[in-house]
UniProtKB/Swiss-Prot annotation:
Native source organism of the sequence: Chlamydia muridarum (strain MoPn / Nigg)
Keywords, ordered alphabetically: ATP synthesis, Hydrogen ion transport, Ion transport, Transport
Protein name (Swiss-Prot/TrEMBL): V-type ATP synthase beta chain
GO molecular function ontology, one term from the record: proton-transporting ATP synthase activity, rotational mechanism
Any GO BP annotation: proton motive force-driven plasma membrane ATP synthesis
HAMAP family: ATP_synth_B_arch (MF_00310)
Amino acid sequence: MQTIYTRITDIKGNLITVEAEGASLGELVQIERADGRSSYASVLRFDAKKVTLQVFGGTSGLSTGDKVVFLGRPMEVVYGDSLLGRRFNGTGKPIDNEEICFGEPIPITTPSFNPVCRIVPREMVRTNIPMIDMFNCLVKSQKIPIFSSSGENHNALLMRIAAQTDADIVIIGGMGLTFVDYSFFVEESQRLGFADKCVMFIHKAVDAPVECVLIPDMALACAERFALEQKKNVLVLLTDMTAFADALKEIAITMDQIPANRGYPGSLYSDLAVRYEKAVDIAQGGSITLISVTTMPGDDITHPVPDNTGFITEGQFYLKDNRIDPFGSLSRLKQLVIGKRTREDHGDLANALIRLYADSRKSAERMSMGFKLSNWDKKLLAFAELFETRLMSLEVNIPLEEALDIGWKILAQSFHSEEVGIKEQLIQKYWPKACLHK
């Protein structure tokens, strides 16, 4: 039963307050304005009969006499195959100039998947980016952020991952996007040929902050249905979680909440965790793998958003100098697939390459300080140049097996086989034959 109220007692920012009974948190509300227009809101807080609503699209033009209708259900988004290839805003309305999308309405605020039905991740998600596939494998159901330094083109990296992944469906949630960013997503999805298996939920920088916080929920609600009902392997890409946290902060300040670290609400950790925990590998079903972008203001890893994120997720990719930094990046689930779902030489080769690259950084530092370089230093510097060009560049698009072969070739071009610290049985099997006795 719908309840109608005609008295708005307070309007502050995108929040309004009404005197109402029987409201529930997250309940969807329709506001019918005097000029005939209507907008939606959701219940954010209530204190006895005093109910605070966050209005989608802003409160401009509202008057205290407008009708407020409690719909008795939570915010919903349409689910179905008709979503594929479509783009929606933070309220679930199409923004691609196409017809209204028909499908099953599903609530966007549901609990995390039942832990009893989860299985231990054991399958790799391929991206054809060597710095991910080879050194920090992405595993089905993993939740992992990309920590992006200022000025890094993280959107291009996301589009590369979306285009090259072997996931069945890609769902993109964009928060605080400029028009240039939004246009880039649309154009790249069409140019790279994955638009037909992609769904986009987009919040632009000019849209209301309350719509920003709904984007992850909409994306993950649809992903969960695709994984559960259609047994699809879904890759969810969220950007930018710092913009999401800033929207939470703006709403909390408007509600006069006591701020915590750097003005963010004390619930920031829980607000992030409840979204990340949607990542799941379902027994007898599909999976949800979640990659998010978290920009670091001032390259500060101790900023509340990346700091809290690091405690929730299963590693991180550190994007710096237009590369995925091998020393700041980590996948805590990679041991579940390396050598088990990949070639036997994967783990030893990756460790040797990173160890030698770390040594080359020390040699580069000695060279910059004017020290005399040894023959070993020169070998390391030559190796580093090959490694950065052929494996570290984000422009490289090769499958894992080819990346492993290239890794062996780089070692053979730079070192003797006994200098790399790899097991003799692997050397005999994988070291390029022409260089075996080098």
